[in-house]
A protein has these predicted regions:
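Short C-terminal tail/terminal secondary-structure segment
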Residues: 113, 117, 169, 248, ...
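Canonical Rossmann dinucleotide-binding motif of NAD(H)/NADP(H)-dependent dehydrogenases/reductases
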Residues: 3-33
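Substrate-binding pocket helix/loop in short-chain dehydrogenase/reductase
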Residues: 75, 117-121, 125-130, 228
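Active-site helix of classical SDR
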Residues: 144, 180, 188
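Alpha-helical segment proximal to the catalytic Tyr-Lys
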Residues: 149, 193-197, 256
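Residue(s) in the substrate-gating loop at a strand-loop-helix junction
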Residues: 164
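Short, small/polar-rich loop/turn modules that mediate ligand/substrate recognition or access, typified
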Residues: 102, 196, 201, 258-260
Length: 272
């Protein structure tokens, strides 16, 4: 197993890409701290992992709640919280340190797209801009900063930020989202440069369109789905498993010489 006994925090693990990464990390032997703003989503992810490990590794099923928004399972912990709240972000990291004494891997996946309505910069409501930045940029900063403090003490660590192809090639009329993911790309490079001497690797994954609950409203419209497929040379929509495979590689020792890299997983969308 490629992540055996590695301690990993995955934010936004209650659905979509985060759920796919959490599931794959568990199968690769990682011990997990999963976080999400939605407890119901975390419980669904827990059930999926419990079932998978029971089938593949003989782990007992079942996840029991405790106090303070933390849920416990034989293979890891769950923290209900919002990455845009500093105390919550720090509590996510502390859950790993408290239980296992270290944190090897952070996947900064929690994020939002903003309004479903196409908006240019001058028509974007200020509160929408601020909320997108608060989650997509400040949330990544808060979790990474808290994790790095522990990684500096232990002398190693790896961070995988989930950015977007939109951080490299902007989507039309999505100014807030594009800017937020561009910031994640730049922040990833800055962290990689600053902390390489401390043996902390930092990379980002830039997904194209991936089929999740967040994108379903668009992909459920047949004309839009086909338009996206036609714009993708590989000829299909991305899946959470595609991103999970990339995350496993970047988090594993196989990527020991990889830092400051933006791994685009988009079926060729940005080259067309």
């Amino acid at each position: 197993m490629r992540l055996a006994n590695k301690i990993a925090l995955v934010t936004g693990a209650g659905s979509g890409i985060g759920r796919g990464i959490a599931h794959r990390f568990a199968l690769e032997g990682a011990l997990l701290v999963l976080s999400d703003i939605a407890e119901g989503g975390l419980r669904e992810t827990a059930a999926l992992i419990d079932e998978a490990l029971a089938a593949h590794a003989g782990q007992p099923e079942g996840t029991a709640p405790t106090t303070d928004g933390v849920l416990w399972s034989p293979w890891g912990s769950f923290v209900v919280g919002d990455v845009s709240v500093r105390a919550d972000a720090e509590r996510m990291v502390e859950a790993a340190i408290t239980r296992w004494g270290r944190l090897d891997i952070v996947v900064n996946n929690a994020g939002i797209t903003g309004s479903r309505q196409a908006t240019l910069a001058h028509t974007t409501p200020g509160e929408e801009w601020e909320r997108v930045m608060e989650v997509n940029v400040n949330g990544v900063f808060r979790v990474a900063s808290a994790a790095i403090r522990g990684m500096l003490e232990q002398g190693s660590g790896t961070i995988v930020n989930i950015a977007s192809a939109a951080g490299l090639v902007p989507f039309p009329a999505r100014a807030a989202y594009n800017a937020s993911k561009g910031a994640v790309v730049s922040f990833t490079r800055a962290l990689a440069l600053d902390y390489a001497p401390n043996h902390i690797r930092v990379n980002a994954i830039c997904p194209g369109m991936v089929e999740t609950a967040m994108t379903r409203w668009r992909l459920d419209i047949p004309e839009l789905r086909q338009q996206i497929i036609d714009m993708t040379p590989w000829g299909r929509i991305g899946r959470p498993e595609d991103i999970a495979s990339a995350a496993v590689y970047l988090a594993s020792d196989e990527a020991d010489f990889v830092t400051g890299h933006m791994l685009v997983i988009d079926g060729g969308w940005i080259i067309k």
